[in-house]
């Protein structure tokens, strides 16, 4: 095939030396560059950096609570740490890959756990009075969870245990946020948008998880296909752990948008915000009065709003 070349036969000693990480993924090391151990697994972390940057910027621009700025910054650290880990396969950078995943996820976990406790208080006055106390109690619990999981990862050095417990924490966030949406969002149109956004955020995670497991359990098969039929550079497209990065990076962004809108509907002032679908399919929360700049719809794949006419209407009002 034109513009293709075979994989090297012998293992290559790269710039970073022998791997010291507890995990070495299916992607063969240093086959594309002597400076990057796992090429595809490294560069696909760009998706975390891009979505985290936009999520942070959007939270700041829309004057959302600080928690959402911290969530965006947290997931940018995940992208940086994962980049360094897959580039070097050194243990010290492995810690910067998986531990920031925990620390970034703890923030939305704390937020949704506190929201759930607050919303169970029916009296509005008591709810406001108890809000700070509830958030502080949940904060201490979250700190305890972080400490235990960090100890498991660093001292016990059992990534599988860490990953299972982290998965349970993430699942709790999904279940509780779904419960809040179903029982405590009463606007049917908003609820529909919420559930669609929630599902759109979850589907990439599920597909990505399948890719991750296939990469682990059928590694020799993928290596055979890459070496025998694809060669380089096409082989880099069949690195399933890299697809895990792309899919979860997208899913994280969408799910954070879902959590933002859920928070506004249950604890904020929804009249100050507009939930839009850029180009009819990409969800985003926008504070009213701010320019949107692209075509959008108010429901998934719904009628496209003419932004020029919409902007003129806002000016006249």
UniProtKB/Swiss-Prot annotation:
InterPro entries: ACER (IPR008901). It is a multi-pass membrane protein. Residues 1-35, 57-67, 89-98, 157-160, 182-195, 217-239 are lumenal. It catalyses: N-hexanoyl-sphinganine + H2O = hexanoate + sphinganine; sphinganine + hexadecanoate = N-hexadecanoylsphinganine + H2O; an N-acylsphinganine + H2O = sphinganine + a fatty acid. GO terms for molecular function: N-acylsphingosine amidohydrolase activity. It is found in: Endoplasmic reticulum membrane. GO terms for biological process: ceramide biosynthetic process; ceramide catabolic process. Pfam families: Ceramidase (PF05875). It is an enzyme of class 3 (hydrolase). Signal peptide: none annotated. The chain crosses the membrane at residues 99-121, 134-156, 240-262. Disulfide bonds join 26-219. GO terms for cellular component: endoplasmic reticulum; endoplasmic reticulum membrane; fungal-type vacuole membrane. Residues 36-56, 68-88, 161-181, 196-216 dip into the membrane without crossing it. Its EC number is 3.5.1.-. Keywords: Disulfide bond, Endoplasmic reticulum, Hydrolase, Membrane, Transmembrane, Transmembrane helix. Residues 122-133, 263-317 are cytoplasmic. The keyword Endoplasmic reticulum applies. Acyl-CoA-independent ceramide synthase that catalyzes the conversion of dihydroceramide and also phytoceramide to dihydrosphingosine or phytosphingosine. Prefers dihydroceramide. Very low reverse hydrolysis activity, catalyzing synthesis of dihydroceramide from fatty acid and dihydrosphingosine. Is not responsible for the breakdown of unsaturated ceramide. May play a role in heat stress response. Belongs to the alkaline ceramidase family. PANTHER family: ALKALINE CERAMIDASE 3. This is Alkaline ceramidase YDC1. The gene is YDC1.
